[in-house]
A protein has these predicted regions:
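Short loop->beta-strand "edge-of-pocket" segments that line small-molecule binding or catalytic clefts
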Residues: 1-20
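Solvent-exposed loop/turn segments at secondary-structure junctions
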Residues: 6-10, 67-70, 92, 106
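Short helix-loop capping/hinge motifs at secondary-structure junctions, enriched
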Residues: 7-8, 20-26, 105-111
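Solvent-exposed, polar/charged alpha-helical surfaces in well-ordered, non-transmembrane soluble domains
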Residues: 16, 31, 46, 50, ...
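Ligand-binding pocket segment of bilobal, Venus flytrap-like solute-binding proteins
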Residues: 17-91
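Sec-exported extracytoplasmic/periplasmic mature domains
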Residues: 19-23, 35-38, 53-58, 67, ...
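Mature extracytoplasmic/periplasmic domains
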Residues: 93, 99-158
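Extracellular/periplasmic bilobal clamshell ligand-binding domains
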Residues: 144-181
Length: 181
């Protein structure tokens, strides 16, 4: 199960990973997936908790976050010793989420206070178990589960932000033509 890159950030990250990994052959990868009846959903939640076999669906592979194995270990009911998900390292793309202050905001002091709070060690140490993302502060302590299943693959697929900005619309249009039509 994959997510539509136009409506889902994990879907976009996976599309970008395939572009980085396969280069000019990325469209062929998607053609093959499509010929094998890949399921496409609009969002992560419906793919993971709906279509994926661990969520009761019929698909045995799902695009998800590198932190999914940790979340499964912590929240599965009934508990599991081995998560139903794994990381395929050469399929990973680094997804970064940002917070910023708008240039002409009328609430600059409040916006600065929010950014300061988001960057505080206390908040950063709450991120892993609440959002299953890595904190931005390197000095933030990680929960034990994050040492059992480390979530930072050693070989990430990367594309520069400028290249993404220049090509994103074209890439998603090609993807839509290849997979959805």
């Amino acid at each position: 199960v994959v997510q539509n890159p136009e409506t889902s950030s994990p879907g976009l990250a996976f599309l970008l990973a395939t572009i980085s990994h396969f280069g000019s052959e990325w469209v062929n990868f998607w053609k093959i997936l499509n010929q094998n009846n890949v399921s496409v959903t609009s969002d992560w939640e419906s793919s993971y908790y709906g279509n994926f076999i661990a969520g009761g669906g019929g698909n045995s592979i799902v695009v998800s976050y590198a932190s999914s194995p940790i979340a499964e270990l912590i929240y599965s009911d009934p508990p599991v010793e081995i998560p139903p998900t794994a990381i395929i390292e050469d399929s990973c793309f680094k997804q970064v989420e940002y917070a910023g202050i708008l240039k002409n905001t009328k609430n600059k002091p409040e916006a600065e206070a929010l950014i300061d709070f988001l960057l505080s060690q206390r908040f950063q140490e709450d991120i892993p178990l609440n959002m299953f993302m890595m904190p931005v502060l390197t000095e933030a302590s990680l929960p034990v589960a994050f040492s059992i299943y480390p979530i930072i693959p050693s070989d990430l697929n990367l594309i520069s932000p400028n290249e993404i900005e220049s090509n994103r619309n074209n890439w998603t249009e090609i993807w839509t033509e290849t997979v959805l039509r």
